[in-house]
Swiss-Prot record:
Occurrences of domain WH2 (ranges): 1429-1446
Main location: membrane
Lineage: Eukaryota, Fungi, Dikarya, Ascomycota, Pezizomycotina
Protein name: Actin cytoskeleton-regulatory complex protein PAN1
Keyword check for Nucleus: no
Amino acid sequence: MYSNSNSFLGGGNSMRPGPQQYGSSFNAGSGQQQQQQQQQQQPPQQSPFAAQQTGFAQVPLQHQYTGYPAMQQPMQTGQIQPQYTGFPGHQQGFQGSAPPMPAIPQQFQHQFQHQQQQQQPPPQPQQSASFLSSQPTTSSSLQTPSAPAAAMKPQPTGFSQMAASFQTGGQSAPKPAQASKGTKIPNIRLSFITAQDQAKFETLFKSAVGDGQTTMSGEKARDILMRSRLDGEYLSQIWTLADTTRSGQLHFPEFALAMYLCNLKMNGKSLPSSLPENIKNEVSSMVDIINFSIAEDSANASSATNAPDFTVRQNTATPPTIQHPQPQPSNSQLLQAQMTGFPGAQQGFMAQANGGGLQPQQTGYPGMQNPQPTGYTGPRPPMPPMPTGLGAGGMGAMAAPLNAQPTGRPGQWGLVNTPSTGLPNIDALHARMMPQQGREQGSFTTAGLQGNAVIPWAITKDEKTRYDALFKAWDGMNKGYIAGSQAIEIFGQSGLEKPDLERVWTLADHGNKGRLNLDEFAVAMHLIYRKLNGYPLPNSLPPELVPPSTRNFNEAIGTMKNMLNQESDFRKNSGAALLPQKTGVSYLKTHSFRGQGGVPTGSRKDATVFKNDDDAVGYKSSARRRIGNGSPRPDSPSSVASNEDLSIEQLRKKIKEKQVLLDAMDFKDEKSFEEDDVLDRRDRKEAEDLYRRIRRIQEDIDSHPDAPLPSGDSDAERRALKRQLQNLKDSIPDLASQVRKTEKAIFEARLELFRLKDAKAHPSSAPAIVGTGPGGAVTESDRLKARAKAMMQQRTAALTGKKIDISSEDTDAPKRLEEESIQARTEKENNERMVRDVEESVQEFARSIEDSLQAGGQTADNEHERRRWEDALGVEDEIRDFIFDLQRSSRSKRVRAQDRRADRSGPTSDPPRSEPASAPRHESPSAPAARTGTPTSASSAGGSYSSYKTPEERAAFIKQQAEQRMAERLAALGIKAPVKGGETPAQRMERERSERAAKLRQAEEEDARREAERQARLAEEQGPPQPAASAPKTEAKPPPPPPSRKAAPDRETAAKKAEEERLAQEQEEQQRQMREMEAKAKAEEDALARENSAAEARLKALEEQVRQGKLKKEEEKRRKKAALAEAKEKEAKLAARRQEIEAAKRREEELQRQLEAMNEEGSSSDDDEPAQITPQASTPTVGSQELERKPSPPPQVAEPKTESRNPYFRMLSQSSEGPTSVSPQASVSPVPQQEAPAPAPPPAAPEASTNPFHRMTAPQTAAPAPISRKRADTDDGWGSDKDDDEDDSDDDRPGGTSAAQLASILFGTMGPPRPLSAADNKSVSSPTAVASPPTVASPPPAPPGPPPVPAAAAPTVPSTPSPAPEITSAPPAPPPPPPPMPSMGAPGAPPPPPPMPPTGAPSAPPPPPPPPPAASSSSAPAATPAGGRPAGFLGEIQAGRALRKTTTKDKSAAAVAGRVLD
């Protein structure tokens, strides 16, 4: 079984070149003994132990410590020492001296010392000799122990486990580095996963199992594998495949296999039913390596030791007890340098826990334990103990491991199984040899590839698999060979020398072809692998390495030569060469390459029985094919028997057969022709059916109401839509910038308005300098004006000797201004944010529209299909004619439909325009929102817009309306509107359902309308003939019975009869013509109905869209007009407020001048002013208003002219019809609405009247009178924005007027009591006179209406809100006329000036307003009699005195007020 069975006796090893195979020698000591004997016989030898090469050929070779460092006793000379050949239970001491013992090397000293420390032997009798027999170095003299010789360096033998079995005990920590144990995973590359994946799996495995563990429990593996989210069935199958040991735990290779199978399944591949052979072998081999390494570690780490303690044991009488060797695994991987000798006196080998050990056996008799002479007295080396008995386990002591051996006959190519020791470094070699980047620049060495593995001559299966994969990786073109240039690159990566590679190529390249096939490449790689593991290259290939292809080819050539030679000799010797050769004789049995004259296994033919077949041709020309393969090919003349050999009967029979065949062929042809005819007719019928269906579908397309307008070029339409969309997108930034400018202007105007209101509400806290810059900022001109004013006041005070009244500073004014500024700025930012949101939404909507337009564009495939089926390119002639015919018919129907639509558009286009205009004239003014049709939807839209209170809601409503309009336009153009991202599927389904229902209703309405029109048309067509036919009947029946006629009754009767016949004939002719006309009309009507079914529906839809577009355009125009009117109205309000303040100040100054009698002309001019206003505002205010309160409908007559289509104006009309505070000019035209608010400051009015939303819900009953409208028209120009602009001139500057005028203006500040009362009267009375204009304003600007300033007027206003409309309906009065309400002294009229309602003023307590205005208002009646002159002046004003020079005073009144810059 073993090639070195005599190794125990020191016999020679295997004769094969190279080192021995693993397990070839039990112990290196057998060879060492002979060498030691030879060395001891040499006189110069100082030590019997010399350096021996006992292990594998590794560089460098180190000395092996083979001695026994026991305490040697001197032995007596002259005696033959016995040899220790067995395992005696008791050994007598040997006399004599032992040879000198070398020192223990340093690398084994710690091991030896550790063994001595652990050794605790039982007390034993002292013996005079050690376990090893000592041999005297001389024959006569007693030798003392000589000095130890040079230490022998340990030599690695490759048998770490075997050496460990002979050690007297295990050591707990052979090396300090082994103290900390981790998870050991062999450095072996798995072929079925990549290196990166294997590294990741190693990391995952180590982190899961922890240190010191080599297997993963089932729970941990389940947790990891469950992360793949595979089905439990698949995971169970993966576990079954991966757990190769069936232990319920996974080693690392099994875990890697499980991860590989999981990845395989996750990628969609199926799991194998069983593992492939290569994967199974790799996993099993690696698992065995891991398990064996664990056993080795446990053996080394065993605590129970039996090593002698050299520090205690000196001379013991009892011999040591020999420990049995421990059976070790055969495939140890970790080769370490081990001590091959016994480091001390042996106490015997103890049985190990891993199996029954070998029991000590005595080889001699128990009494024969004394030294025996051996016949040789020369020096002998110490012989180690040799186990000769058999243990309980039935194993020989330390038997050599079993290696895989080729089982076939010698020299036969075959793939053997992988040796149990594995193939170390084969993966590293395979990885290096694979094609990879950067291999051209690398210099390769044998580092990492060398080893001392035992490799058989034959190639193993694992090797062959790797070599084949490597060959296929390099043979990318599948040429089947590797060229010499590639071989240089591949083999050069092994790092071998060039001569070695040349020998490898010479051995592998059989026949010197210059290239290697698959088998030859495997041979070359195997030789390289053997060379890397220390084996020399052979001079010629052994039989095990000869590839089958080479061997079979050579054998085939030789066999062929032998056959030819034998055949030639046989023919020559037998004379067969002179005979004709028989070509039908088979030589297969004798000329077979496979068998030696055996019977062939199959029906295989060789060349010896070849017979040519003329019918079996390999090529047939296409011209020689028969149609349908119906006619058989005539036989070759060579194969047809000669007709000469046939008899007459046979010839007749053949003729009859041929005739039958011909008849059958004719019948088959007829049948196939009939079948083809049937198929053709069926195909034609189907084609006609398809033609009809296509025509019907085209007609449906042409008549469908939702069909897009056919313009002939959809691309042109799409480009036009894109251009239009781009223009609209370009206009968005411009609109946004305009909105931002408007917001900025509103912000500045709001601040300016607040300043004016605050100055009016808090006169004492008015700032000394009023800013006229942007946003109310104080400019240098304002400072100059204020300085000039102060100097003038000082001069006036110095001239008059009066004290200057310096108003106290109000610290709350800046705070109020700052709060208002923050509020206005916040609102401005919110509006700008909404504008940005709207802009972004519009941009997004535009992008979606653009994408939809782009998606509908022509692609290459669409263009190809369009050119094929619309332009009829690349189709059959019949289909091309059909396409053109279809296009012509469709075009003609379209033209007729357009003509009819054009004819109907004339009479039908006017009523839609007249209906909306005429309908409002007949409806009652109390229900303007009850209109039907399109105005209803517009009204509802407007109402919904006005119902939104916050700007965010209005912005969202505007965005929704814009998207709806755009969707309608896209639907009209045949483009599907994009679905909004925020719309849920349920909402989309509901919307689509409602759209379908609406379309269905519209289609039904269209059908009903068309039916009614058709019936009407038929009635019109049938109407004229029926009276004509009935008239003769009615006329013919009365004449026959007249009995009164007496002259020639027979003649008359004949004439009447002839007449009746003629009339009957005419009637029949007319009826026939009528029937023909009816039939013709019906046919025409049917044709028209078919042609116009969809055109009329589309016409109505288009007309509706056009009307909607016109309405929307008108609505947008009115909206723009309303916005312009609103802006102008705001400017007019600001101007009116400025004029009011200016007028109040002028009035105060004029009253002061009157009291002081300084300027009589100024007082007379002031007296003229109220006189002019009194008849305008006071007289008609109550009289005409009370009388004309009921006839409210007349003002509504002219309203629909401008508001019939605009929902926003209708909402305003609804809110303005009820309240009485609305000025009548609101229903006249947009122009009066813009001019009316000029003199009206809304902030001073009560909150109930300035809020438009509050007015909509307030219970107001009266309506303005037309006379007051006229007065308002006359007064509008007085306070218009134009006049205000004209008033602003250079005269406003202090330097623009004379010093005398400035002095006269400033004199008014000297009288504190009266200015306060006058200012209070003005501030209280002026809002009452101008409270109506805010009601005319549109809803949007209404929210900022209620500022804090109106609180000054609160004492009198909130007490009686219901009668307030009656007084506020006199807005025509200009700002200066607070007293023109003499007739309103009634207690129910709070707004009139304080002098008039002394009872009403105190009756209303002032709730929230500041105390100064309330005090001044309450003290006004008391101040009137004190002065006397103010009462007289007011009396004059009440009497009707008018102020004639109002315009002159207005021009010179803007000195102390700011204005809004354009």
